[in-house]
Structure formats: C-alpha cells, structure tokens
Regions:
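Active-site and adjacent substrate-binding regions of carbohydrate-active enzymes
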Residues: 1-432
C-alpha cells in the first residue's frame, strides 16, 4: 500500500516491500513458531485503496486497461458499488481513496476467501502459516444501505478460515455491542473495546473516542461509575456462549486511541489499577506495543499513539515493565486468572472490586478513582475466600482491613489507589 497507515491496499497477494516482502514474512513466521509464538495479520477486506489493481482510479501503479474505474465492462466493476452509468462510487466513511467492496459479487467472494488460492487462504498456508486474521472495520463490512450481507459473508469466511486452520483466530474490529457476531459461527472475538477498553478508560475519566466521533454525544460530559463498569462488562458477557468469553481480546490501548499512561490526569497507581483490571477480566489481555515500557507519545492524534518502538532505549527495569511482567506471570501461573470464575465484589461510585477464583485460588483487584479515602465491605466468602494472605498486596501496597464474620472484611481504600490481593480460601483458613 502506498500510504503510511497501509489500509489502502493495492495488492492482497504480496507483502509490502516496506515490511520486507513475502520472504520476510515467511522467515518471521518460522522464527515465531520455533519460539512457540503466534502470528496474526491485519487486513481490510471492507475496502481497497483507489490505486488497487481491481480499481485503478488514477493508473498510479497499473496500466489504464486494468481496473473497475477504467473499464466499465471489467469483472472487477462488480467488486465495487458504482452508481449506474456513472463513475461515482461508495467509499468507506466518505474517504475517496478507500472504495468499498461489494460482496454481492460471487467473483469477489471467490478471490477473497473461497478459492484455494484466495486472499485469506493463501496466508494461512505454508510457508506463511499465519495463526489468524484481524479484520479492520469489521462492524461495517458487507453492508451498504439495503445491502446487508454481513452475517452471511462472515459465516462463509469463518468456514473457509477454519478449513485451513481449525485453531486460527478470527479477530474483528468493532467498538460497540457486537454480540450478534459472537455466537460461535462468525467471529472468535472483537477487539474488546465495548466490554473492556472503553469502560475502564471512561472509569478513569478519559474521553471515549467512539462517542467523541459523534458531534452531539461528545458535547455531553460523562464519566462511568463503578456500577456502569460492572453492568457494561456483565451485559457484554451475558450475551455470549462461555467458550467465547475465554476468547475475548481485552485491550486498553491501540493504534486508534491515546495511550492511557500519556494522560497527565491519570496517576501511576490508577494506571496500575487499570492494567490489573484488564488482566483480571475473562479472556486474553492485549498489550499494545510499548505500553509495557511506558513508551512516550501524545494524546492529540494518530501519530501520537503510534510512536516507533525505542528498541535501543527500552528500560526493562522500570515500574511499568515490572507491572506487566508480574501480571503476565500470574496470568500464566494461576488457573483462577484463566479458567476461574469472575465476580464483582464491590461496585459503587468511584471504587470497583472484582474477584477471580478457582478452587482454593482467589485473587481480588480493587481500583479507586475517588478523591477520598473510603472503607468498603468485601464479601470474600461469596468467592470462597476468608481474608488476604498477607498484610501487603502483590505489589507491596499495605493492606488495612478488619475481618467481620469469617466471610467479609472491612477494608480501607486510599484515594486514587489500586490493589491486587491473593486471598486465603475458607477451607485453608479453617486449618490455620
């Protein structure tokens, strides 16, 4: 693709030379798999670039005999939405350089995902052997006014992908409530803004990009309460089969939103609490590159969210790195954080507490965005716990609490503070 962002594709069948070409991808895939890592490629099959061979608006890379824009009788004309007897065409969000693909065309379906050498199948096969696809702007894919083919086409796409690799991960960009795609026959997960990223960011008092894009809604200041966070997350999960819960791609930051740690209004303890909550939720935490080392940036535009990784200056011993390192270790080590149940123990005003539990393993995370120190009651017995194991949390924060009845504790929560506690199970406590 000719642009910096690379979403204006001109050739789906080759890797951009800026990224090393096809051979570089094959080598990367081999090295990753040798180290027990996975590889997911990002793609937009909702639209191409106007310079794509199929469209070829300005003859920038292809001869004037090629493409739908130049040749009204070409097969590729049916790949796009053109007005009758006109060169006017539908494009994504009004961006003329991104003409929208028309999945009414059976020929388009064949070349994108059905044929043995189609776009999506090619990269799942050796020597590339990718492990999944991330689909850009999946929420508007295969939709245009009266043309509403999304569920039909996604079902077909899933079938074709899983034929090549049954374990391939289908990740879709959608910022809203997308439960209709998550019933087992279409996506494996959205980029979970709706049930993770957006709610945690709003709880911290940060603007919501999804709402900011709406000229009316962005005029209404709104900060999510703890009750809102609990309700949104549980509303999202309650609509999904449990196996899909486990697939959720839980993120805080991405290439489309400012990094939380670059907001001056969020202190280090609140940021730590946000990351802890991300790791506590059912599903898989997604760490946006550089967040683990506190990469610099700004909050004013795409370039500020996408600073290059400072490979020669990575401070792997700072507090942020140790935070992610510790949480990644816990997530891998304890079944409570992967297979265990999840329950909100407290959600009022500016304080939220959530537990993960499996047999005798119990972890409780607390985040306060309140300006005031408060005391809260935690019903630990409801998740099989009696009390915290230690007088400090897993990051060394002092815990001040009082046991009530063997099943609940009163706990002091400092202003703008976060805690992650490992707790003693009720059965274990009875033996001590």
């Amino acid at each position: 693709a000719p642009s910096i962002h690379k979403y204006d594709c001109i050739d789906y069948f080759h890797v951009d030379q800026h990224f090393g070409g096809d051979e570089a991808l094959a080598e990367l895939s081999k090295a990753l798999h040798e180290n027990d890592m996975k590889l997911i490629l990002d793609i937009s099959i909702n639209h191409t670039g106007a310079a794509h061979k199929w469209f070829n608006r300005d003859n920038a890379f292809f001869d004037s005999s090629e493409g739908a824009y130049q040749n009204k009788d070409s097969k590729e004309r049916g790949y796009y939405f053109f007005e009758e007897n006109s060169d006017n065409y539908v494009c994504w969000c009004g961006v003329k350089n991104l003409p929208t693909l028309n999945y009414q065309s059976e020929d388009l379906r064949k070349v994108v995902y059905q044929d043995e050498n189609s776009v999506l199948r090619k990269w799942l096969k050796p020597p590339y052997s990718i492990d999944g696809w991330r689909f850009d702007v999946a929420d508007v894919f295969a939709r245009n006014n009266e043309v509403q083919l999304a569920h039909e086409v996604w079902t077909q796409i899933r079938k074709c992908i899983k034929e090549e690799n049954p374990d391939a991960y289908i990740l879709a960009e959608d910022w809203g409530d997308c439960a209709g795609y998550l019933q087992g026959s279409e996506w494996d997960s959205p980029m979970n803004y709706f049930g993770c990223g957006r709610v945690i960011r709003q709880f911290l008092g940060l603007p919501d990009l999804f709402l900011e894009r709406n000229e009316i809604l962005k005029k209404v200041p709104y900060r999510m309460t703890a009750e809102d966070v609990q309700n949104r997350i549980m509303q999202h999960l309650a609509k999904l089969p449990y196996v899909i819960w486990q697939n959720q791609f839980n993120l805080l930051d991405s290439h489309d939103v400012p990094r939380i740690h670059n907001y001056k209004t969020v202190n280090q303890d609140e940021y730590r609490g946000a990351v802890i909550l991300q790791f506590m939720l059912v599903g898989t935490p997604s760490i946006y590159y550089g967040d683990e080392v506190g990469i610099k940036g700004d909050i004013y535009g795409d370039e500020g969210y996408r600073y290059p990784m400072p490979w020669s200056q990575i401070p792997c011993s700072n507090d942020t790195y140790r935070l992610y390192q510790k949480l990644a270790h816990l997530k891998k080590e304890y079944k409570a954080l992967t297979e265990g149940g999840m329950k909100f123990l407290y959600a009022k005003g500016d304080i939220i507490a959530v537990a993960r539990f499996y047999e005798e393993e119990v972890f409780v995370a607390i985040l306060s965005v309140s300006d005031q120190e408060q005391k809260i009651r935690l019903p630990l017995g409801s998740v099989g716990a009696a009390r915290p194991k230690e007088n400090r949390d897993l990051f060394g924060k002092e815990l001040t609490y009082r046991a009530l009845d063997g099943r609940s504790i009163w706990m002091k929560v400092e202003a703008h503070q976060a805690y992650l506690m490992e707790c003693i199970g009720i059965v274990e406590s009875m033996g001590n």
